[in-house]
């Protein structure tokens, strides 16, 4: 009988384990403001009303697909809000931002995975920034 050498087969590409912040910890650390909570609730209700044909408007979901520059994302959101107010009688504009790039196999993986775009993979920082 051949004896197997004790060779590592699990976690061989792990440099350093890092415990991630949990969703409940993150919610406690960075709670939603009353304004954000109201915006979310009102937006969800408006979409529900459109889907149930209680509201005649259409809704349009727009990007950006992913963000890396928070200042630019805030500027984009402000411009989009102006447009949304102008067309609000007929269209509900919903801004959707994704914090990861799930179909990307090479290069930057997104704000959560690599928030500083330097391959440091500070995921907990990315989660906080995304929140």
What are these regions (language model features)?
Residues 39-57, 68, 72-86:
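Generic N-terminal targeting/processing segments that precede catalytic cores or assembly contacts
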Residues 63:
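Conserved, mostly hydrophobic/aromatic
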Residues 18, 32-39, 68, 72, ...:
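Catalytic cores of large soluble enzymes that bind and process phosphate-bearing ligands
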Residues 1-12:
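N-terminal catalytic cores of peptidoglycan-degrading enzymes
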Residues 78-131:
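A generic, well-ordered mixed alpha/beta core segment in the N-terminal half of proteins
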Residues 10-54:
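N- or domain-start disorder-to-order transition segments that initiate the globular core
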